[in-house]
């Protein structure tokens, strides 16, 4: 590994989900892949923990809803 900074290029997406249904996992920044959905769009050091969205749900029931911002990784630059 000859890089220390990860610069993801992301597309922003705002989604409406059932409140409390968001499931995430932590991943080291150097393990990020194209197509991953992350919660923060910024530069990371290679050993930073990044929250990656695993699952969420949306139903038509009267459950409370919340809007969240997701960033879908389109390209990754490593410096």
Curated annotation (Swiss-Prot):
UniProt superkingdom: Archaea
Protein name: Uncharacterized protein MJ0607
Organism: Methanocaldococcus jannaschii (strain ATCC 43067 / DSM 2661 / JAL-1 / JCM 10045 / NBRC 100440) (Methanococcus jannaschii)
């Amino acid at each position: 590994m000859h890089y220390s900074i990860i610069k993801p290029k992301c597309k922003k997406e705002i989604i409406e989900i059932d409140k409390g249904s968001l499931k995430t996992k932590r991943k080291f920044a150097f393990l990020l892949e194209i197509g991953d959905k992350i919660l923060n769009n910024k530069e990371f050091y290679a050993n930073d923990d990044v929250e990656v969205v695993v699952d969420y749900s949306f139903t038509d029931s009267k459950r409370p809803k919340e809007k969240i911002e997701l960033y879908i990784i389109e390209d990754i630059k490593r410096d």
